[in-house]
């Protein structure tokens, strides 16, 4: 019986020491590395080709393994170089108590807007086509988004880890031209560091 108790105590001590999921406080910062906007037109071709991504991810994990975070990033689009897809999301996440790696699952909600010189809601755009001038509402009304994400971190030293993340964002209610709902759902991958105190 003493051997069993000693073995359980030793194993528990090693597990608690080897993972920072039991840290009092953890702060993580990250940035997007790549993104896709998989919307397709009626021919099955991609509507948006991603040019670049920028922004940040911040998360603070509380002592009871639940954390809060914020994502703010922009996705540049190749086929419309002046247009960017701007997303701001607030997250709640949970770190699974797994030894050796830090696995996080999270959910978030927020808003998404299309940014460009003629993208403000209510902007009228005029174009000449076959010698005739046409005017239309070229603005975009911001929409709400939801996301789920996961992050896997590998401890480098007891005080910090490096992690990779994958975010799946659902956005199907940005209104273009006054009445057309657009599908700007996307996926974003990122990299970051977490500091454990």
Regions found by a protein language model. Name each.
Residues 4-13:
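Sec-dependent N-terminal signal peptides
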Residues 24-26, 154, 184-197:
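Outer-membrane beta-barrel "beta-signal"
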Residues 58, 68-72, 92-94, 105-107, ...:
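Membrane-embedded beta-strands that build the outer-membrane beta-barrel scaffold
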Residues 46-56, 62, 84-92, 99, ...:
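Residues that define the transmembrane beta-barrel architecture of outer-membrane proteins
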Residues 37-49, 73-85, 114-133, 138-140, ...:
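Outer-membrane beta-barrel translocator domains and adjoining extracellular loop/strand segments
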Residues 21-80, 99, 109-114, 196:
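Short glycine/proline- and aromatic-enriched beta-strand/turn motifs that initiate or cap beta-hairpins
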Residues 66, 101-103, 156-160:
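Secondary-structure transition into beta-strands, especially the periplasmic turns and strand N-termini
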């Amino acid at each position: 019986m003493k051997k069993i108790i000693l073995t359980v105590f030793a194993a528990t001590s090693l597990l608690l020491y080897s993972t920072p999921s039991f840290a009092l406080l953890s702060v993580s910062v990250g940035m997007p590395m790549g993104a896709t906007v998989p919307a397709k037109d009626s021919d099955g071709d991609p509507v948006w080709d991603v040019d670049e991504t920028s922004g940040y991810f911040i998360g603070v994990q509380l002592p009871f393994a639940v954390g809060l975070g914020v994502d703010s990033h922009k996705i540049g689009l190749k086929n419309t170089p002046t247009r960017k897809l701007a997303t701001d999301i607030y997250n709640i996440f949970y770190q699974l108590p797994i030894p050796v790696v830090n696995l996080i699952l999270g959910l978030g909600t927020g808003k998404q807007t299309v940014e460009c010189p003629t993208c403000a809601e209510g902007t009228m755009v005029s174009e000449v086509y076959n010698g005739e001038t046409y005017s239309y509402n070229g603005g975009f009304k911001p929409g709400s988004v939801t996301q789920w994400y996961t992050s896997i971190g590998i401890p480098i030293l007891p005080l910090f880890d490096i992690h990779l993340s994958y975010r799946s964002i659902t956005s199907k209610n940005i209104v273009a031209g006054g009445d057309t709902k657009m599908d700007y759902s996307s996926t974003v991958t990122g990299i970051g560091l977490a500091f454990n105190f």
